[in-house]
Amino acid sequence: MISKQTTPAWAAHQALAQSSFCRGLAWRPVGPVKIGARVEAIAIPPGDTGRIYAGVGSGNLWKTVNNGLTWRPLFEHESAFAIGDVAVSQSHPSVVWVGTGEAQPRYAGYAYPGTGVFKSVDGGASWKHLGLEATHHIAKVLLHPTNPSIAYVAALGKQWIPSPERGVYRTLDGGAHWEKVLFIDEVTGVVDLALDPKDPNTLYAWAWQIEEGRRGGLFKSRDAGKTWRRLTKGLPTGPLGRASIAVAPKSPKIVYLFLDNRAPSTQKDRPFMGGEVYRSEDAGESWRKVNTDDLYDVFGAFGWKFTDICVDPRDANRLYILGNHAFQSRDGGATFQRLGDRILRVQETPGRALHLDHHELVIDPANPERLLLGNDGGLFLSYDAGESWLHLNNIPVAQMYFVATDNQTPYRIFAGTQDNAALVGPSDAILDDATPDPWRSVYLDRWTGGDSFVTLPDPTDERFVYYEHQNGALMRMDTTGSSILSGGPSSESLRPRLPGLRFSWYTPFFISPHNPRTLYLGANQVLKTVDRGATWRAISPELGEPAGKDRDAVPTGALTMLAESPLVPGILVGGTEGGRVWLSTDDGATWSRIDSGLPRKWVSRVTLSHHAAATLYLSFTGFRENDTRPYVFISTDTGRTWRSLASNLPPECVNVIKEDPTDPKLLYVGTDLGVYLSRDAGQSWESLSATLPSTPVQDLTVQSRDSELVIGTYGRGAWILDLAPIRKPTSEPLFLYPIRDITLDPFPWDSVPGDRRGRPIARFSVVSDTAGAATLTVTSASGSVVRQWQANLLRGANTLTWDLQTEHKTDVPAGVYQVEAKRGTRRTSTTLTVRRSGK
């Protein structure tokens, strides 16, 4: 059930979705499943070994009732998709609280904000919004162990600007009312909370200024949060980074801190002290550093991302710390051993190691050998205290930056993802718990992951795929080679080695649409190769802003987007982190600024028209300034003048704008909360998000041959929408669009009556000028009725399905079938061809 919220942005989003002509069109998820994504929050009900709640950073909340064999999303139609924390009441296990907004703030990256706190009293079946929407990033939800009405929230606040909403909040009435009980200042939030299980009035909080500061530190309350005092005895004086707190359940006077000490290091190769473990044996009144092992490399310079610490509920000297790797100590934090790399997976992958970058560890209090670990590769389960793991990689939550397609049958989708490398998968992939994931990795790093962005097949030789690591590391992989290890014998680095180059995290790269041997790469200059990357030359002067001028908004001062006209070779447009937009009409010989009157914000997309060489599209994002206004522009005179296309778009950051290759009036926009369509060249917009989960859409592309829109989401993988009702509108009162032929494999499913998993289904689009019930009838070539059923049509475009079974629940034989829709006296029909593969 969708919670009723009244924030203006969410109200505008829902209003467009529910009024859209296309609200009945169903998106089809196609994966991938097996690569996972960043799991930042885990909760298990007490005494229940089958139920697990997993919060994915930007991929909603998921639940299993069978210890990870199958999963379902619980939180996919709310105003927030980013999960900061999830907590289950110990006294009432059906009560689940969610704090939204990622607790992993990033410079130049995506740590999406949330809209406050949500609560379910039925195990996640329905949700109620409890407010605190202005906190943006909630790092912890802490529930009283016996009183379900009492809860505490640690709020980091707005990431990019001063925020009075930071601090600790308390409710005494189940979330109806909130009181801020700890506030440091507008730049210092709270990143962790812990309580004494034997005295729930005793609380600990770690205050943190991203990335470091002196106002933060450890605070303690002995009166359920009414008053707080800072604890300093034996702790470093600062600057202090992130930290986590763990109270030993068996001996609550023993408290641990795992912190990022940002004080200058005495070692020349280290800018600061880094990871340290502190222990108190008097409930936090005094502390001593206990680690004798050097922990600097546990997270190196990335302490703002990690520091989780957990204590065994039965042994106060057994603890775990998380960073790039995960470690265990059996001697109270003096020495640490890395957890094991023996991995089994629900879905098989080529990876062999435990994924890097660990964010959450839960120890089962009933069985401390049972661990649940969340990292950048998903969720891992251990029954031997971390010596071996089962990777529960059966949740479709890939965080995609980029998507492209080819023209094979079925066409393939190429994608670059955060943390989980470059991928390729078929557009007819079926997502269910019985079907192996057909996606495969273009490459993997040695830790079964890697950040990847633009991923493109070589147009001249399908064996080769171009892909990127961050910051300009362009590679080419021979997919028929002996290894998919990036940097291995089958991959080749194409990174330019010219002096003075600076690259943005997501480096723009493309293959020229006019010459497949010509590649372009965007740094602080535009780089070009005419020999597939063997040699490069700069074809522009410095185009970016001064590097490091503003670390948040302009981290490198390089190009973020670069594109060439599909109509005229050598017309190039590039955009930078700081909002500069450049044009060359002579393949880089000369460049001019064309950004007069445009916002000085991160250029999120540059698109050149398929229909008019002088028409350009731009989108900008104010994400890094906490500005969610939509910035979309068009120029019809090669950038001399610009006109806003924001029109009725809701307040959502825009990540991409594309023009339909067949019709210049059809435009598509992907935002931080969905997809929008314009039929009138941007004068007005309608939503395509009604059947899409709340998810950021980072990229989209039109597959023209199959007339489908493919989107890459940052948290829910790739999705496909039929464009036939959009590209070919009809004036008929009832119209059934042609159905694509379907090929069925004969085994093994035919031998398992009633099991439809893994089976293709027929999908077809129907447009109706009024809402109401329709009768669908499938007849064979001989005219006999094969199947008949009722469907409720919305006014506008609808997606209907048929499971390819007869009235007697048997599979239909190969043949040509007529499919008819009838509403009242209106009838419309088309044909469907079913084939058998003969395998």
Annotate each predicted stretch with a short phrase.
Residues I2-T730:
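Beta-propeller blade termini and top-face loops
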Residues I726-R757, G838:
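Short, compositionally biased P/S/T/A/G/V-rich stretches that sit at domain boundaries
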Residues A681, T779-V785, Y817:
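Short, glycine-anchored, charge-dense loop/turn motifs used at functional sites
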Residues M475-M477, A771-A781:
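Beta-strand-rich binding/interaction modules
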Residues S619, L744-A774:
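Glycine-centered coil/turn sites that cap beta-strands in beta-rich domains
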Residues V30, A718, F764-V766, G783, ...:
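Terminal processing/anchoring signals of secreted or surface-associated proteins
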